Design a protein with these regions (language model features):
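Conserved glycine-rich cofactor-binding loop
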Residues: 7, 14-16
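Conserved glycine-rich Rossmann-like NAD(P)H-binding loop of the short-chain dehydrogenase/reductase
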Residues: 28-44
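The beta1-alpha1 cofactor-binding region of Rossmann-like NAD(H)/NADP(H)-dependent oxidoreductases
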Residues: 40, 60-72, 113
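Catalytic Tyr-X3-Lys loop
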Residues: 92, 104-128, 143, 147, ...
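Active-site helix of classical SDR
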Residues: 131, 166, 174
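Alpha-helical segment proximal to the catalytic Tyr-Lys
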Residues: 136, 179-180
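Active-site loop-to-helix junction immediately N-terminal to the catalytic Tyr of the SDR YXXXK motif
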Residues: 157-164, 176
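C-terminal helical subdomain
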Residues: 183, 190, 210-222
Length: 222
């Protein structure tokens, strides 16, 4: 087991890629702390991990709030005394933003300030806050690994507006963090998957008339 005795935080672990990543980390021997807003989703992830012989706990947090991100880190340290791995997966593209568009993209100038801020807060602010509070712990330890989940949409000029901007920001933030933390024995990387078969992706595909799109699985990413 490659992750035996390691403590891993997985954000957005209630479903989709986050759940698959939590299960994969646990299968490799890590003690997994699952984090998301919805406790019932976390309960199911923890149940699946334990059912397969793994070790897991859960923390319900709104990670767009800096105080709650700090509280997450404090709670993990109180429980386990260290943080070896952070999987920065929390994010999303709320369906209320694209519902009723009749397969039409939101052009850049059509985004409301509220919509734009919501997407940036969910997809870029959360990974920033998690790194902000986890990295000092890893520096003290002299080691750690961080993996953030970006998207193919963050690497191209896409029709997804703020979502693409946020996911592209993750790539740049990852490169910055990697350069600034390498002297402390910390490795920072990102993955940028294409379409992944998750509940949210299926809803989005239907809204834009792509029900027959070929998708990868969350396990592929994990």
């Amino acid at each position: 087991m490659r992750l035996k005795d390691k403590v891993a935080i997985v954000t957005g672990a209630g479903k989709g890629i986050g759940r698959a990543a939590a299960l994969a980390a646990a299968a490799e021997g890590a003690t997994v702390v699952t984090v998301a807003r919805t406790q019932s989703d976390l309960d199911e992830t923890v149940r699946l991990i334990r059912e397969n012989g793994g070790t897991a706990s859960s923390l319900s947090r709104d990670l767009t709030c800096g105080e709650q991100a700090a509280s997450m880190v404090d709670s993990v340290l109180q429980m386990y005394g260290r943080i070896d791995i952070l999987i920065n997966n929390a994010g999303g593209y709320p369906k209320e933003i694209y519902e009723g568009r009749e397969h039409q993209a939101i052009r850049l100038w059509e985004w409301s300030e509220e919509q734009w801020d919501q997407i940036i807060r969910t997809n870029l602010r959360i990974p920033f806050l998690c790194m902000k509070h986890v990295i000092p712990v890893m520096i003290r330890q002299g080691s750690g690994k961080i993996v953030s989940v970006s998207s193919r949409m963050g690497r191209i000029a896409s029709q997804m507006g703020a979502y693409s901007v946020a996911k592209g920001g993750i790539v740049t933030m990852t490169k910055t963090a990697a350069i600034q933390t390498q002297e402390y024995g910390i490795q920072v990387n990102a993955v940028a998957p294409g379409m992944v078969d998750t509940p949210g992706q299926r809803v989005y595909n239907h809204s834009v008339g792509q029900d027959d799109a070929v998708m990868g699985s969350a396990d592929d990413v994990a």
